[in-house]
Amino acid sequence: MAESGVEILCVGTELLLGDILNGNSRWIAEQLAGLGLPHYRQTVVGDNKERLISAVREARQRCRVLVTTGGLGPTPDDLTTEALAAAFDTPLEERPELWLEIQQKLSAGGRPVAPSNRSQAFLPRGAEVLPNPKGSAPGMIWSPRPDFTILTFPGVPSEMRAMWTETAAPWLQANAGTSGVFVSRQLRFSGIGESDLAERVADLLASTNPTVAPYASLGDVKLRLTACAPTADAAAELLLPVEAELRRRTGNHCYGVDADSLASVVIDLLKQRHQTMAVAESCTGGGLAAALTAVPGSSSVFQGGVVAYSNAVKQALLGVSLDLLTAHGAVSQPVVEAMARAARERLNCDWAIAVSGIAGPGGGSAEKPVGLVHLALAGPGGCEAWVQHFGERRGREAIQRMSVIRGLDRLRLCLLAQV
């Protein structure tokens, strides 16, 4: 007997080989949690009919609902519908009204109608069409067995999401026996490691409703809080006291929630204080400016930046003296201090972050190894500088990313400390 619950089956050799990031499974998992549907397994299968059939038959033994993405196009390697029908010895039938709709959609979009498109109008006997409002590839809702239902979606994320929202989610709510509504909230932390954070909140990690789970990524640690209740409002209420206690224990290490980034938080703090900022970058190559300008509305507080990669540009655009560069080198505290002060003055702003380091893989020495980064922050109260040792094992991209994070976080803390 199959368990109650949902499995996700993503189809496509491009997913299996890692050529395309599988964002569909993550999004669907979030939607299932919001519907209160238990979800225990995700599978990726390449464009191979026999392996698809095997994966579907195995899922049949474990779950009551199988959600598939991919393999619904008109090309020879789009095998999902054919494999599903074969898995349950069910013939495919052409749906004339569906074929007409496919032709109309293609023509309306200025695309030619190829003979191969007709294959998309074939569904297993007894299947219900799952309409695609954004594309030509229809999905289906099909129950080949009384206690087992399959929902199929194309792999294109925008099409899949529209189909889910308009048709699949209401169907699942009405037919899949939800156990409650799950609500999640993610707290984001900086300047604290995963193990240190876990020690501070060890007792809360053992709670069951809400659950608290740590996740770590480069320069960022997260705690995901998840609660289940009959309604979304009731689940959200369960989260409130736990979130308050987590914030109390971690202080300013907690910089935001959910989609917040350090850059977006810094932008908001600057707006609240009617202040502006700029950057002067060397080893990050514009990474600081890119992070800030990725935030909508950043133009009201971000004046601009200088990517001074060479010593000549440091001299010409930031006025760093040749004597300073000769005496200390580009990767040094005196130079980043001069860069930060110059950026603040020349771009006429309240704050300026400067960074210069050795991101590698070459260019390091015993005195200044790969991973050494000097940063400075010039502000209304003066200029402070500090050094980070990220180590050469992290790699160039990680060193650059960590430098951006450390610079933004120092500015965040200084803004919070303002009276």
Swiss-Prot record:
What Gene3D superfamilies is this protein classified in? 3.30.70.2860, CinA-like, MoaB/Mog-like domain
Question: To which protein family does this belong?
Answer: Belongs to the CinA family.
Q: Can you say what this protein is called?
A: CinA-like protein
Annotated membrane-spanning segments are none
Q: Which PANTHER family match?
A: NICOTINAMIDE-NUCLEOTIDE AMIDOHYDROLASE PNCC, NMN AMIDOHYDROLASE-LIKE PROTEIN YFAY
Coiled-coil stretches: none
Q: Which InterPro entries match?
A: CinA, CinA-like_C, CinA_C, CinA_KH, Competence-induced_CinA, MoaB/Mog-like_dom_sf, MoaB/Mog_dom
Instruction: Fetch the SMART domains from UniProt.
Output: MoCF_biosynth (SM00852)
Q: What is the lineage of its organism?
A: Bacteria, Bacillati, Cyanobacteriota, Cyanophyceae, Synechococcales
Q: Which organism is it from?
A: Synechococcus sp. (strain CC9605)
Q: Which Pfam families match?
A: CinA, CinA_KH, MoCF_biosynth
